[in-house]
Regions:
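N-terminal glycine-rich phosphate/adenylate-binding segment common to multiple enzyme folds
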Residues: 92-103
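Short, well-ordered alpha-helix to beta-strand connector turns
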Residues: 22-23, 42, 64, 91, ...
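Long, charged alpha-helical interface segments
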Residues: 126-144
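Short phosphate-binding loop-to-helix
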Residues: 67-89
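Short Gly/Thr/Asp-enriched flexible loops that form oxyanion-binding sites at enzyme active sites
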Residues: 104-115
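N-terminal beta-strand-loop-alpha-helix module at the start
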Residues: 1-60
Length: 144
């Protein structure tokens, strides 16, 4: 798998033309609502499903989307489980959208989850009209 998209819950200002094509799309809980608003279809929904709207969940079931329902009490966040799922699939490029605003603990949780990864994947978090590139073990060549 080359390119994966993780769509986090929370506010999301990303528009469709900011996105490339993806081999796999994973929605984290209410992130599924963002996926559908972008006229995309998730391959997997991960979460304890405490924030997803019932109509979105019903649509996902109708679309035969795989749903990985997690326990509410766990040692990792829904996002951490989602990103580890993608990393275990040996994806080269991971793009993350969503989770931009709202509860500050969620924002920092997402940020620290990414920073603490020991990975070889290229990770980009699209935050509004900005792209945050997280370093990995590869070299980044910036042309002049």
């Amino acid at each position: 798998m080359k390119n994966a998209l993780i769509v986090n819950g929370g506010q999301n200002s990303t528009v469709r033309d900011q996105l490339q094509s993806f081999d796999f799309i994973i929605a984290v809980d209410s992130g599924a609502e963002h996926v559908y608003k972008l006229f995309l279809k998730p391959d997997l929904i991960v979460g304890d499903l405490d924030s997803i709207e019932e109509k979105t969940l019903e649509r996902a079931k109708k679309d035969k989307i795989e749903i990985l329902k997690l326990e509410e009490n766990k040692d990792q966040t829904d996002f951490e489980i989602a990103i580890n799922y993608i990393i275990n699939k040996k994806c080269e490029n991971i793009t993350i959208i969503g989770g931009e605003y709202g509860d500050i603990d969620h924002l920092f949780g997402t940020l620290f989850s990414i920073v603490n990864l020991q990975n070889n994947e290229k990770i980009i978090w699209i935050h509004g009209n900005q792209k945050i590139l997280f370093p990995n073990s590869s070299t980044i060549d910036i042309g002049t």
